[in-house]
Amino acid sequence: MPPFISHFFLLSTFASLALCSFYCKNPGYPCLNGGTCLYNGECNCTSGFRGFNCGLDSSTISAACTVECHNKGICYNGDKCYCTKDYMGPTCQQAYDFADCNKSSMKIKAYRPTEFNGEMFLMQSMFGCKLAEVTSTIAGYKQYELDVPHDSTGPCKLKKTIDATTGDVHFEVNVSTIHHAGQFGMYDGLKTVSCHYSSRDQAIVKDVTNQDLIVSVTASDGSTPNLQEIPSNDVIHLTFKPVNLPGGYKAVKILDLEMYSVVEQWNEINSMVLLKDQCMTQKADELGYSVSNEVDGTSGRAILKAIPLFENVPAPVHFNYRLRFCRNRCILKSCASPSLKPMPKGEIFKHQGQGIRIV
């Protein structure tokens, strides 16, 4: 057969590959409990049985279950899960085809029945991008893997897209399965596996202090830097600036922030949690600290009112904090707005100035 005819046959066969994972005409995918394999690769179940392979006895389906079945799995016998055709495991938590999304690569993995004697490869290159069989981590299945670097430029190159707004990065690739080596048929499959790297998620959390030389922490009133004293009820700008972040990380934001004061002669300490999981706490709001959590370029900044923790005692305030480091830029979560507080009954309303007219 001339080479160009063979090449055309290969391309046209790829175009006809199916998208589903179970075909009873393929080795290792039988119809159970007396089910019949139809011409289209689906199972026709006998009375009382159901499911893609007729493997579920309808009389055993449980309304109450002691386990949680994932990915649309069905609970039976009270503590077991019958999975859909694309998932496996005790609670249907494991996909047959998936990827481990690593820092610099995408490791493609797949499980197949022990009767499987075919091949798996990336759609764009049958010969250069095969998944290799490795020692299986799940009994009763064969396991296949291929580790593809994110920056691969060869035949195994991944499809990469970047969200211009969020900076999120998405990699994907089509994985072909043929059930008879060197042969293509209408019951062979094609699956898309992907990795999504969110600019919010690509980060690490670390307890830090100034001695770690990872960030510098400065306090100001918005104009004068590195303040050591600030009048009560003035505004504090507390800035966390990256200095020597771990490899690959460029920006920082504040997760948690606590202010505390110690009066040594009384052996007492007072503290106030200002930010929790990036948002101002209800108590800080009620006591008037008016905390704002912000991102300024690569730095994280908290702006708050300077309210002493001890009345009439000049005790310095200190801060405990937890930070998140981000690879590109940090994006803050959306926090619920503080609730409006009604004026107590009998309170005389006082105001000064002409105010602002809202039009």
From Swiss-Prot:
GO cellular component terms given for this protein: extracellular region
Keywords from the UniProt entry: Disulfide bond, EGF-like domain, Repeat, Secreted, Signal
Protein's name according to its UniProt entry: EGF-like domain containing protein 2
Cystine pairs: 24-37, 31-43, 45-54, 65-75, 69-81, 83-92
Gene3D superfamilies in alphabetical order: Laminin
Keyword Acetylation part of the UniProt annotation: no
Residue ranges constituting the EGF-like domain according to the UniProt record: 21-55, 61-93
Tissues with expression: Prismatic layer of shell (at protein level). Expressed primarily in the mantle with highest level in the mantle edge and lower level in the mantle pallium.
Keyword Repeat: yes
Signal peptide range in chain numbering: 1-20
Major localisation: secreted
Subcellular compartments: Secreted
CDD domains attached to this UniProt entry: EGF_CA
